[in-house]
Amino acid sequence: MEFPSTSLFHRLLGGIMCLVMLSAFQSASSHLWRRSPQEINVKRSGLRNMPSLANVTVEQLSRHLNAGDITSVDLVRAYISRIEEASEFKAVLQLNPDALSLALALDQERREKGSRGPLHGIPILVKDNIATKDNLDVSAGSYALLGAKPIVESSVVSTLRAAGALILGKTNLSEWGNFRGLNVSAGWSPRGGQTLGAYYPNSTPEGSSSGSAVAVALGLSAAAIGTETFNSILEPAEFNSVVGLKPSRGLVPNDGTIPISSRQDVIGTLTRTVKDAAYMLNNMAGRSERDERTWNIPFKEIPNFVKFCSGTDLSGVTVGVPRNSFPADPTSPIMVSFEAALRTLASAGAQVIDNADFPAADEFKKLNQQVKGIVRSSEFKRDIVRYLSTVENNPHDIRAAEDIIEFTKRHKEEEYPNRDIGKFLWTQAEGVDVESEKYNEMVEQERFFGGEGGILGAMDKYNLDVLVVPSSFGIGNDLAAKMGFPVIGVPLGFYPENTAIQLEDCEPHLVRIAPGMPYSITFITKAFSDGVLLRVAHVFENLSKVNEKGPKPFNLPVTELSKRSEDKNNL
């Protein structure tokens, strides 16, 4: 885990010492508690019944904070300890040196003015490609942008702060959002090292929002935000058995992120439950003057997405299964679980339409990766220049994709050429330019494959509310990403004990499939139908209870709130 500087490390250490003294003073001065000993015992009893920090929800934490059972300071101290205990996973890249002072201020505000809402005092982690105006860096995991400060903060981070959320730190990621090379392991960055998955030793976390997913799985924060161009939220959510939500493009502002494609990038959430994702979305969605895509939100007021997360009835909902969009081995554990999931949805009252296929799926599958990447490469080439124009104190004078390539080649920390730059090099290929005819042809192809040739073709033909596919793989998520449609991944199951271990092809050959590793189910719908998506996902989650029944992360941190709170009271 990296701290921004020695002086900032001392500030954090000083803050911890200050809080230890403050806790001792509170213990010696009983009138500061404003409760009788009997009341304190009642509160402690309630706290002991609270789930582990690896399982507790945002809603539960908010309730305990409002009841006075715990404070935000307690939460920050506990999460910092857990982050230290889980350092081998390299999920958290950088701690906010001001986290404890922010927690004190939020606790005081709660006492004096009441709560701002469900996120008041809740510590969250932010992916290291999202700009924050504080003492945290934003570098996409690369030393090239270390010290390059954003002029303005991401609108999403600002709205989360306004809701009372506490930015605990930055998470590790696949460098440059996994837009560097073809032989670079997911979850690796020069600054953060190799993030590891939570469910099996030396396993891949997938990416690029790797640290955000692993942190939530291990209980290193209450929730986290990540970004997705294609599968960068959904895959790490799947491999770490958490909920990954990629909202509709334009529902959540995307300014202040280090881009791959401003046309396709979306900020989303990694949470323990679907309802937690809804709480986060309530405080992220909305119009921003800095993101013109949000100006086209089709409703005057942002819905209360939490209201969609209730009950177990799906009567009136039609769910389609596009079988031609994913591999179908009926004996695989994923497919066995998927077929059971379809029965669960039907038992809840949903009408399940099988073989609601994408009209042009076979044609789309024939396109090779580089042809598909022409659009992303062209947009990265343009959009990274735009982003770099918004930073100050740019110590390495990085102004364009060419500068990133040269920096990567020159600096040994970037581990070139062992870790290649194949995707970067696509930006230098002929015709890779947003003004080129080839680019515009590919954009039109994407609209067809995602629209009438894909998702819209299937949904309109069969009058569907939602599509459902197994795992985060297949072409469904790819087409949804190209169209800006919302997608949510929910835990579906775990590989059985007799599963043969499979490794990644690229070094360091992390474990990809193994006994007890998780997989997910994915729901897709049309733009700005996020509420329907959350409703279906919440019902499935409630009926299946996959994480309650299944294996747990193999090496969870040990610090818990109840222990820290009792220790504090005994100082």
Where are each of the predicted segments found?
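An N-terminal boundary/leader segment
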Residues: E2-R111, N135, A340-Q351, E406, ...
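Short helix-loop capping/hinge segments that flank enzyme active sites or metal/cofactor-binding pockets
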Residues: N49, H120-G141, F308-R323, I374-G451, ...
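Short, well-ordered beta-strand elements within core beta-sheets of diverse protein domains
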Residues: Q60-A67, A144-A148, D265-R272, F523-I524
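Acyltransferase
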Residues: V76, L104, S154, N304, ...
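Structural helix-boundary/capping segments
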Residues: E85, A162, L166, A217-A328, ...
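Conserved acidic residues
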Residues: K90, A222, N463-D465
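Short glycine/serine-rich loop/turn segments
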Residues: H120-D265, T294-W295, P322-N324, P470-F473
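An extended, acidic, His-containing surface patch that forms the Zn2+-binding/catalytic region
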Residues: S436-N440, E444-G493, L503-H509
